[in-house]
Amino acid sequence: MSTLNTITATLFPETDVRHLTKEELEAGLDEIRRAPKDEGLLQLIVRRPGVEQREILTEAHLDLEQGVVGDNWKRRGSSMTDDGSAHPEMQINIMSSRVVALVAQNRNRWHLAGDQFYVDMDLSEDNMPAGTRLEFGTAVLEVTAEPHLGCRKFVARFGVEAMKFVNSELGRQLHLRGINAKVVKPGVVRVGSAIRKLH
């Protein structure tokens, strides 16, 4: 597995970044809606080896039990499960590269969103409801029904208007914050791989 860079992502990463206004965010909706529906492109892979840590990868190994191999999903656990174990329906986080490009404003800040995969593809509820399967390199992922929403870290990094934007009714319909998925077939995926919706 090839690692391009290891980055420590703090909760309050910069002091000189201007967060976008509601109007500026809404102006990006048309571009987001133009994302391809059936075959997209994987633009960034991020592994989270520890809390507030990010590793930018050129490829990732996807495993049925671990999700992204080396990621802290399984070790981190979840407050949404009765026993605090990792949530099986939130194993993989995927975000639209068009959305993160809008809210982050700079590609060097994409990793701050905290997702593992950033794809140029329509992630909306209409195009990718729960149960949709995606060919991810040699692996296959299945979209789950667990919602993926902006939180306080998202506010700190991208602003309160960005959080309102992704968590709004329209934002939820378009899955602007992204989608959750799980591995149903293990394999390897690389930056630049085509991501295909399986029918």
Predicted regions and their residues:
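Metal-cofactor-dependent catalytic cores
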Residues: 1-199
